[in-house]
Structure formats: structure tokens, C-alpha cells
């Protein structure tokens, strides 16, 4: 069939008449639906993943689902005033948080806005919520310790600067207490701290803030709060916000400690957001990228070399390394560490401190299970004197737990086995520690030396705690020079050993407890 010229011109005219001349808005869109903090938007063709988008009334959201004909976004704040048909605009900026020295001592929400009633924060700048972790070439090995002040951790599960050490256990086993004690111990160390509270009761966070202020650690700490009452979207971004604030100090050649309390609740929030965005669920209804959720966060904790710091500060800081040490917390259900999220985070981190309900209920606090707790890189960073004195302690406790289990089936024990059990009972008592009472290196070394040298063997088990308190008080008053030397140098040698032996013998001979 042939078309003549007249028919062809008619066809072309029809095509031209039916052509839609309206231009597609690439940086603007309109709300199609809004529910449960999730918005479906038509338009926004140029939006990036993770970009901050602006609604009316100065409300912001974050684009998370980029589909062929729509965008799925979460609203970071109140969404009750957002209606179908409202205009949404791109900002060409990823979600950012304020950073800087001005943030220290303040309580903020995940967007960096003050919620402590002390007025606005005049921040030094802003950083994107998510950035790439430092590469292999930018990193330095972990070889400097971070003292938590907790005997059981510093002696047996040491943490180094730049390490990721997981704190894991059931609810009400003292996970937050361990992390808060570690923060309190940094008040005079120059190490900055960030505490991220995710999905917690406001009353619990208020208690933490009050305790940090009481013990003089708040001025050195940023507290990021996404409480149980805020939207899942804010709980999801809270750890990344805290990490961005901490990285500001790391990239200037400083040392930072960050606590994520806890990442289980962040995973729950992310699962909720993902299901509302209609992403396909996987194991335990978590989305497929829940491993990446935590790995990309925890990989940002690192020790960086001087070249990286110089590059990040444009040459202003030279010859200085920086570090970001992470203490993520994971809550288990019924002691099940083989669940989905716990196994993920265990595989990402450089070791774990496992807290046990049975030990906690037995009065052994912190309730650290020495057999299941490990630090994969902290040994290289441990203070010399604690490393040399602490090795024997771990062995004593391990043998004690084994022998106690064996002794249940046998009433007739030889003298050597009974002596080992007696030693283990005393070491177990010695490892107990009250909350909010971190110890210095010298105080810890004194107690570890007394256990290692058999100086506790003639003291009744129920008197060990009284002996410990009195011995520390005696050393602070009568052995000031020795204690200062141990704190400053941190090395262990025959001279230190002899001086400690003489001092403790003198205390046992001339003092009571």
C-alpha cells in the first residue's frame, strides 16, 4: 500500500497536534499520598538517593526509594500538615548535620537541633550524614589503648583507639552502664565522646545526662537522642548523625569514643521504614540490606594516619593521627547471640563484651562472661603493665569456671584444685566494680598485682571488696609517687614490682579493712 503526499502531511499534522508540550519538572514534584511518615511523590526526576527534599512549612524529608514514575521518601519530623497535592522541591544536598566544638555538652536530635533548653547551637559547619569510610591506605593500625576504667575490660578484653568493640547481652544486664562508665573515664583524657540514644525512654536518657553532668563528663560529650516517641526515620538516621559529629574531631587529629545505644532498635526502625516503603522483606522481615545498614556505619570507626588528617584539614594539622572508637550495643533475646542482627554485628566488629543475665543476678557486676568475650585487636594496644598483670587473671578465671563445673560432680578434691578454686573465687570478687567508679591505670595495676602475687590468698572471700577499697585509699595517700609513675609511664618492670610488693605488704601488716 502506497501513501500519497497529501495523506503523509495529514498524519504529520495529527502527530504535531497531539504532542504534549508540557515540560517535565525535574526538581519539583507533588505529593501523591502520605501516611505513617512515608510520602509518595510524583516528579523529582533529578533527585538523588538520600537527598534532602523540602516540603511546605520548613519540613524536610529524605528520598529513599527512586522508582520509575515516583519517589518514596521519609519525613524527618511532623507530617500532619502535609497534604496530597503539596509541592515538594529538591535541595541538591544530601541530609547534613551541624558539627563542631559548640556541639559538646549539648543534647541534640538526629538533625542536630538542640533539645536541652539551652538555646540554639552556633555550629562550626555541617557534614553529610553518610560519607565513605576511610580507605585502607588512610588507616593506621590500632596500637594505642582507650582506658574504660573497668577492671574486667581493661585487663581481659582491652579496647584500642580506632577499634569497634561490641557490647552484647539481654535487657537489664548493665550494657549501658559499661558504656557510660567508659565515657566518664575519658573526662580528663582529652578523648571526645558521643553518646547516641536510639529508641530509649526519655526518662532513661535524662538519667544518663544527669549522671554525666554529675561526674564532670558532659562538657566533653555530645548526646544525640532519637527517643522511643520519635518517628522510625529519625531513629534510623540517629547513629549516622552521631558518627558524622564524631568524624569532625577525628579528621582534625583528635581521638573520639562513640557509643550506639542500641543498634537493635535502629535495625527495628529500619525494618519498619523499609516495610512501609514496600521493600521486599527477608529473614525475620528485615530488608535485604540490613547487614549493609550496620557495616557502613561501623566501618567509619577507624584510626587514621597523619597524611589523612593533613589532607582533611588542608595542611593545618600535621603529624597527628586521629581515631574514632565505636562501642555499639546489641540487645539479645534470651541470650540468643545467633539471631540475625547479633550475628551480623559480631562479624563486623573487632570483638565483643558478652554480658550474662545469670552473672548479673548472682551479683557479679559488670556481668562479663570471660569465656565468650574477646578483643581481636585490643591486645596490641593494651597498656604494658595491665597486659603483663592481666594475662594471669584471665587464665585464673577460665580455670576457675571449668573447675567449679567439675567440682559439682566430685566432693573429693585434691589440694591443688581446691587452691585454684579459692583463687578463682577471690579473683571473681576482685573483678566486681560499682557503677560510676572507673579506676586509673595505677589503681588497676595495684589490684591485679595483689591477685597475681597471691597476696589475696589469705583474705576471706567476703572481705575482698573491703580490702580493695582500703588498699586503694592507702595507695593514694601513702604511695603518691609510685602511683603517679605508673599512670605516666605505664610500664612494668622489676622495680615497680618490688615497690608494689613492699607497699601492699606494709598495708596488710599495719592497716585493717
Swiss-Prot record:
Q: What is its EC number?
A: 7.1.2.2
PROSITE patterns tied to this protein = ATPASE_ALPHA_BETA
Positions annotated to bind ATP? 169-176
- Its catalytic activity? ATP + H2O + 4 H(+)(in) = ADP + phosphate + 5 H(+)(out)
The record's PANTHER family line, in alphabetical order, gives: ATP SYNTHASE SUBUNIT ALPHA, MITOCHONDRIAL
Q: Which residue positions does UniProt flag as site: Required for activity?
A: 373
| Database matches in NCBIfam families | atpA, PRK13343.1
Q: One GO CC annotation, please?
A: plasma membrane
Q: What is this protein called?
A: ATP synthase subunit alpha
- Alphabetic keyword roster: ATP synthesis, ATP-binding, Cell inner membrane, Cell membrane, CF(1), Hydrogen ion transport, Ion transport, Membrane, Nucleotide-binding, Translocase, Transport
Task: Give the organism the record lists.
Answer: Vesicomyosocius okutanii subsp. Calyptogena okutanii (strain HA)
**Which gene does this sequence derive from?**
atpA
Q: Which CDD domains match?
A: ATP-synt_F1_alpha_C, ATP-synt_F1_alpha_N, F1-ATPase_alpha_CD
Amino acid at each position: 500500500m502506497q501513501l500519497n503526499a497529501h495523506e503523509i502531511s495529514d498524519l504529520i499534522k495529527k502527530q504535531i497536534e497531539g504532542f504534549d508540550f508540557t515540560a517535565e519538572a525535574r526538581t519539583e514534584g507533588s505529593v501523591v499520598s502520605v501516611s505513617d511518615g512515608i510520602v509518595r511523590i510524583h516528579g523529582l526526576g533529578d533527585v538523588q538517593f538520600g537527598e534532602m527534599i523540602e516540603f511546605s512549612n520548613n519540613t524536610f524529608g529524605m528520598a529513599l526509594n527512586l522508582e520509575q514514575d515516583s519517589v518514596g521518601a521519609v519525613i524527618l519530623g511532623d507530617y500532619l500538615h502535609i497534604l496530597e497535592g503539596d509541592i515538594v522541591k529538591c535541595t541538591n544536598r544530601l541530609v547534613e548535620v551541624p558539627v563542631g566544638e559548640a556541639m559538646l555538652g549539648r543534647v541534640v536530635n538526629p538533625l542536630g537541633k538542640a533539645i536541652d533548653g539551652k538555646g540554639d547551637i552556633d555550629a562550626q559547619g555541617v557534614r553529610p550524614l553518610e560519607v565513605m569510610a576511610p580507605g585502607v591506605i588512610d588507616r593506621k593500625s590500632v596500637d594505642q589503648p582507650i582506658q574504660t576504667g573497668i577492671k574486667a575490660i581493661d585487663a581481659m578484653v582491652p579496647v584500642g583507639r580506632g577499634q569497634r568493640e561490641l557490647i552484647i547481652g539481654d535487657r537489664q544486664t548493665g550494657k549501658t552502664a559499661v558504656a557510660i562508665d567508659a565515657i566518664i573515664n575519658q573526662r580528663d583524657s582529652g578523648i571526645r565522646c558521643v553518646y547516641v540514644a536510639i529508641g530509649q525512654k526519655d526518662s532513661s536518657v535524662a538519667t544518663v545526662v544527669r549522671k554525666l553532668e554529675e561526674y564532670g563528663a558532659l562538657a566533653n560529650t555530645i548526646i544525640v537522642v532519637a527517643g522511643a516517641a520519635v518517628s522510625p526515620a529519625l531513629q534510623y538516621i540517629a547513629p549516622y548523625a552521631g558518627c558524622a559529629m564524631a568524624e569532625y574531631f577525628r579528621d582534625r587529629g583528635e581521638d573520639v569514643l562513640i557509643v550506639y545505644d542500641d543498634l537493635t532498635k535502629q535495625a527495628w526502625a529500619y525494618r519498619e521504614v523499609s516495610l512501609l516503603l514496600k521493600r521486599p522483606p527477608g529473614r525475620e522481615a528485615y530488608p535485604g540490606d540490613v547487614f549493609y545498614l550496620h557495616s557502613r556505619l561501623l566501618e567509619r570507626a577507624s584510626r587514621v594516619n597523619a597524611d589523612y588528617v593533613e589532607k582533611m584539614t588542608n595542611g593545618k594539622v600535621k603529624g597527628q593521627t586521629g581515631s574514632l572508637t565505636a562501642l555499639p550495643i546489641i540487645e539479645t533475646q534470651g541470650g540468643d547471640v545467633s539471631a540475625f542482627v547479633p550475628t551480623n554485628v559480631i562479624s563486623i566488629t573487632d570483638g565483643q563484651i558478652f554480658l550474662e543475665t545469670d552473672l548479673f543476678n548472682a551479683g557479679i557486676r559488670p556481668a562479663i562472661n570471660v569465656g565468650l568475650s574477646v578483643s581481636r585487636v585490643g591486645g596490641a594496644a593494651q597498656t604494658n603493665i595491665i597486659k603483663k598483670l592481666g594475662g594471669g587473671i584471665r587464665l585464673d578465671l577460665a580455670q576457675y569456671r571449668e573447675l567449679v563445673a567439675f567440682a559439682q560432680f566430685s566432693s573429693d578434691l585434691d589440694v591443688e584444685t581446691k587452691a585454684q578454686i579459692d583463687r578463682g573465687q577471690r579473683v571473681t570478687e576482685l573483678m566486681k566494680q560499682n557503677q560510676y567508679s572507673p579506676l586509673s591505670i595505677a589503681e588497676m595495676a595495684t589490684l591485679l598485682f595483689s591477685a597475681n602475687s597471691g597476696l589475696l590468698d589469705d583474705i576471706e572471700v567476703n572481705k575482698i571488696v573491703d580490702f580493695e577499697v582500703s588498699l586503694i585509699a592507702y595507695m593514694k595517700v601513702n604511695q603518691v609517687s609510685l602511683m603517679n609513675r605508673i599512670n605516666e609511664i605505664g610500664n612494668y618492670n622489676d622495680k615497680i614490682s618490688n615497690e608494689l610488693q613492699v607497699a601492699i605488704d606494709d598495708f596488710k601488716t599495719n592497716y585493717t579493712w
